[in-house]
Design a protein with these regions (language model features):
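Conserved N-terminal catalytic core of the sugar/cofactor nucleotidyltransferase
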Residues: 1-8, 16, 29-30, 34-108, ...
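Anionic-ligand binding region
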Residues: 133, 142-167
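Catalytic-core segments of class I nucleotidyltransferases/pyrophosphorylases
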Residues: 126, 156-253
């Protein structure tokens, strides 16, 4: 069994964090005492993943190289790809196909923070012959603000809607995804069809629906704290939480 590799998606303009992101990639902003990118890298590191690619965008490439280098001081091997313009999560993921080379892949959005390790779920995914996609779900008080999933009694995802009105599910789809290498076949097919949304992006939701329609998407409902640090309020609130948890450095070697 090949080891799983990791992808951190760290592009985007960070418009919800303006003016902080006018001259800085949002993933370099601090979450309490560490850059945001340290938190997402730590999620991969905690799962035992050592081979990582970071997909960048915008104008802060040199800052990432200076901060992280090739990853050796963190016990990681870090490589980089560059998304020239905003084209969506699935398009960004397509840039990593040559790096992944047929392996399973754990993908995390660089502004997402997970309090606990998901290693037990990765161990299960690596031996799972039924599902090629794990999506991580968290119950939220206001489902209308998120992409929402529905599960059957076996944990299979049966339905997904983006920011639905008054849904009878409150399970938000977070920014952590496990995929088999089949994800690149689906992305390639979408690229060939030019299946971009009205906002000009190749949507990861459409790729996840392909897995769902084949009965290959599983929902993982987890209990630990999750934060999307994409707004100023969320950045402040999460920084206070991390301070109160008092766990020290998240990224080993930092």
């Amino acid at each position: 069994m090949q080891e799983t590799c990791g992808i951190v998606l760290a592009g985007g303009m960070g418009t919800r964090l303006m003016p902080l992101t006018t001259s800085m990639n949002k993933h370099l902003l601090p979450v309490y005492d560490e850059p945001m990118i340290f938190k997402s890298l730590a999620s991969l590191q905690r799962m035992g993943i050592k081979d990582v690619m970071i997909v960048l965008g915008g104008h802060s490439g040199n800052s990432f190289f200076h901060l992280l280098g090739d990853g050796h001081r963190f016990g990681l091997s870090i490589r980089y790809a560059f998304q020239e313009k905003a084209g969506g999560i699935a398009e960004a993921l397509s840039l990593t196909k040559g790096f992944v080379r047929g392996r399973n892949v754990a993908v995390i959005l660089g502004d997402n923070l997970f309090e606990e390790s998901m290693k037990n779920h990765l161990d299960r995914f690596e031996t799972d012959s039924k599902f090629d996609c794990y999506l991580f779900l968290k119950k939220v008080p206001d489902p209308s603000e998120f992409g929402i999933a529905w599960l059957d009694e076996n944990g299979s995802i049966t339905k997904m809607l983006e920011k639905p009105d008054n849904p009878d599910s409150n399970m938000a789809i977070t920014g952590l995804y496990f995929y088999s290498a089949e994800v690149f076949e689906l992305i390639d097919k979408s690229l060939e069809l030019g299946a971009y949304s009205d906002r000009g992006e190749l949507e990861i939701t459409d790729i996840n629906r392909f897995f769902m329609d084949q009965g290959k998407a599983k929902g993982i409902l987890f209990d630990c704290h999750w934060a999307d640090c994409g707004t100023i309020d969320a950045l402040i609130e999460t920084s206070v939480l991390v301070k109160n948890w008092n766990k020290g450095p998240w990224l080993i070697g930092a």
